[in-house]
């Protein structure tokens, strides 16, 4: 077969994977608010009102995703479609609604471009929450890891950024759910009775912030009622 035909067929097959527009999967729980969600308007509010900054980029929206076994390396990952962040892969609004097993690994990837005004500032990458354990790469360099499905975390990614052009983020996630003794609420692989569907992967807002070289990272109020 002509090489040009093979290339055309391969390109057509790849385009079909990402050609389908995002839409919710299933119809188990649908509220009036869920019906209004789109990749363009998903969770646009600043995620940390206690310490709000003017210069920030919301990374919620469509990311590429793939589910592999845990032995699959990054270089062998083939992305199979798009997932709407920040919804867990098991959820309807993710657009995927797949069962995620403790032996699986969930991969995310997306690109972003920084505003030129951020050039002389530090850039911090924030995750509201990722369930349960994850690794994060920026421009193919490992930035860090995090373990725990309910708490926010962040990385200063300044030294990993390119001087210009698109930047790439990749996240790999594993979730033992009820196969290990971890904080998981009522999540269980076998949903029955009082148990409910697991929540795996990115399930809170992901965002970038431009900060000065010296900046306030956290505020911890301390009160003393006796002094009043």
Predicted regions and their residues:
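Short clusters of hydrophobic/aromatic residues that line enzyme substrate/ligand-binding pockets
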Residues: 33, 46, 83-85, 216-221
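Bacterial N-terminal signal peptides
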Residues: 8-16
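Predominantly extracellular/luminal regions of secreted and cell-surface proteins
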Residues: 61-86
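N-terminal pre-domain segments of enzymes
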Residues: 20-56
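Bacterial N-terminal signal peptides that target proteins for export
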Residues: 1-7
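Histidine-centered catalytic/metal-coordination loop motif
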Residues: 80, 95-96, 100
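Short, solvent-exposed loop/linker segments at the N-terminal edge
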Residues: 223-228
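Accessory beta-strand-rich segments of carbohydrate-active enzymes
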Residues: 64-68, 88, 98-218
């Amino acid at each position: 077969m002509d090489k040009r035909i093979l290339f055309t067929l391969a390109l057509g097959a790849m385009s079909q994977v990402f050609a389908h527009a995002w839409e919710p999967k299933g119809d188990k729980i649908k509220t009036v608010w869920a019906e209004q969600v789109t990749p363009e308007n998903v969770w646009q509010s600043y995620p940390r009102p206690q310490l709000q900054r003017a210069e920030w980029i919301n990374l919620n929206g469509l990311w590429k995703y793939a589910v592999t076994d845990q032995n699959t390396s990054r270089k062998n990952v083939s992305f199979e479609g798009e997932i709407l962040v920040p919804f867990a892969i098991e959820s309807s609004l993710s657009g995927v609604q797949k069962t995620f097993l403790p032996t699986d690994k969930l991969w995310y990837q997306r690109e972003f471009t920084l505003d030129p005004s951020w050039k002389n500032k530090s850039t911090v990458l924030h995750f509201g929450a990722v369930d349960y354990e994850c690794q994060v790469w920026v421009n193919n360099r490992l930035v860090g890891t995090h373990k725990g499905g309910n708490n926010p975390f962040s990385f200063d990614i300044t030294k990993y950024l390119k001087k210009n052009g698109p930047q790439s983020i990749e996240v790999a996630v594993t979730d033992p759910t009820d196969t290990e003794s971890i904080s998981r609420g009522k999540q269980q692989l076998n949903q029955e009775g009082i148990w409910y569907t697991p929540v795996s992967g990115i399930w809170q807002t992901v965002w970038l912030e431009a900060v000065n070289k010296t900046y306030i990272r956290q505020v911890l109020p301390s009160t003393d009622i006796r002094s009043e």
